[in-house]
């Protein structure tokens, strides 16, 4: 393309999930409810884990960090998507687009590694119970969380380095509700085949390696429990089945979109909903409703803050502050 006749793209047009006005209103209500559930549900987990001393253990420490990542992951694009359902101009600036690419890879990569850390915690608890306290110390948990952020940051910066210096001087329409890296890359004013290869290698190493580690750890846990007791095996499988389902819903779309980006499909933007919205909704449900300790702690927190006497005291404080 002749640079003299080209113009630099300053913004991108996001086509969103659909163009139907009736569906736009439905999607606005639906995703508004889901986003509210994500924020409140994960904040409740963080509050419960930090305030209840009985939950100050490695498993719940990692769960609290997962809830924080889920809130961040749902917030990088969902609020704008919800606002765009009621907007006639669904655009995003170039810097805003780069920011979305940065945050989606940072939080998604962080969650992948964090899920492996949580699986490792369960592996040590079940397969090496006598050494659990020694292995899963507070320092170890902190290091695992730091590693998850470090790995995701390296992954993100390497992905961003492929995109930020690309020349965008022509088409600026992204058929998605956020700036999806494979789609944005194809809008560049040059042959992006080599860059797509680098994206595949980068994303493939992270997603496939973490997914393989997760599956391997689950298999080892199930085999270990099965060798001890068939009844315990059934209980462990019922617990892990829901975790595995969430892992598949999270990793499946990521692997399909980012490890196979050469053919862009309209289905991709709907698959992206799974790891940006549905997984952050399901994680609090899976890790709370199927855990007796968490349910008891959540019930205690809710009763403490929502009991009638507490509410009347709070309303009295509010009224007093206005006088």
Swiss-Prot record:
Cystine bridges: 97-189
Glycosites: 5
PROSITE patterns the UniProt entry points to: G_PROTEIN_RECEP_F1_1, G_PROTEIN_RECEP_F1_2
Source species, domain of life: Eukaryota
Residue spans crossing the bilayer: 26-49, 58-79, 101-120, 140-158, 196-219, 236-258, 270-289
A Pfam short name: 7tm_4
Its membrane topology: Multi-pass membrane protein
Ranges per topology, Extracellular: 1-25, 80-100, 159-195, 259-269
GO MF terms, alphabetically ordered: G protein-coupled receptor activity; olfactory receptor activity
Keywords: Cell membrane, Disulfide bond, G-protein coupled receptor, Glycoprotein, Membrane, Olfaction, Receptor, Sensory transduction, Transducer, Transmembrane, Transmembrane helix
Major localization class: membrane
Protein location: Cell membrane
Listed InterPro entries: GPCR_Rhodpsn, GPCR_Rhodpsn_7TM, Olfact_rcpt, Olfactory_Receptors
Cytoplasmic topological domain residue ranges: 50-57, 121-139, 220-235, 290-323
This protein's GO CC annotations: plasma membrane
Classification via SUPFAM superfamilies: Family A G protein-coupled receptor-like (SSF81321)
Chain's role: Odorant receptor.
Protein name (record): Olfactory receptor 4K5
Organism: Homo sapiens (Human)
Lineage of source species: Eukaryota, Metazoa, Chordata, Craniata, Vertebrata
Name of the gene encoding the protein in the UniProt record: OR4K5
């Amino acid at each position: 393309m002749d640079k003299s006749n080209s113009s630099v793209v300053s913004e991108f047009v996001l086509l969103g999930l659909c163009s139907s006005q009736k569906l736009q209103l439905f999607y606005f209500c639906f995703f508004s409810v889901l986003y509210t559930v994500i924020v409140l549900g994960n904040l409740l987990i963080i509050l419960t884990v930090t305030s209840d001393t009985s939950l100050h253990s490695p498993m719940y420490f990692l769960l609290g960090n997962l809830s924080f990542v889920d809130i961040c992951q749902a917030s990088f694009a969902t609020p704008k998507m919800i606002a765009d359902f009621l907007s006639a101009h669904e655009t995003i600036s170039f810097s805003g687009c780069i920011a979305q690419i940065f945050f989606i890879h940072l939080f998604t990569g962080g969650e992948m590694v964090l899920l492996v850390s949580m699986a490792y915690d369960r592996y040590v608890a079940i397969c090496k119970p006598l050494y659990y306290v020694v292995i899963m110390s507070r320092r170890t948990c902190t290091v695992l969380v730091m590693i998850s952020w470090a790995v995701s940051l390296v992954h993100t910066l390497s992905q961003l380095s492929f995109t930020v210096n690309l020349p965008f001087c022509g088409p600026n329409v992204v058929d998605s509700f956020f700036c999806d890296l494979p789609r944005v890359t194809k809008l560049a004013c040059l042959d992006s085949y080599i860059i797509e290869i680098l994206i595949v290698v980068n994303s493939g190493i992270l997603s496939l390696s973490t997914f393989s580690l997760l599956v391997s750890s689950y298999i080892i846990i199930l085999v270990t429990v099965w060798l001890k007791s068939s009844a315990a095996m059934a209980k462990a499988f019922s617990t892990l089945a829901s975790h595995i389902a969430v892992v598949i819903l999270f990793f499946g779309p990521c692997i399909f979109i980012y490890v196979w980006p050469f053919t862009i499909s309209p289905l991709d933007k709907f698959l992206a909903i799974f790891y940006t919205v549905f997984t952050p909704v399901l994680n609090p449900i899976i890790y709370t409703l199927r855990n007796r300790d968490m349910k008891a702690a959540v019930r205690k927190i809710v009763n403490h803050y929502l009991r009638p006497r507490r509410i009347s005291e709070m309303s009295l404080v509010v009224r007093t502050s206005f006088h």
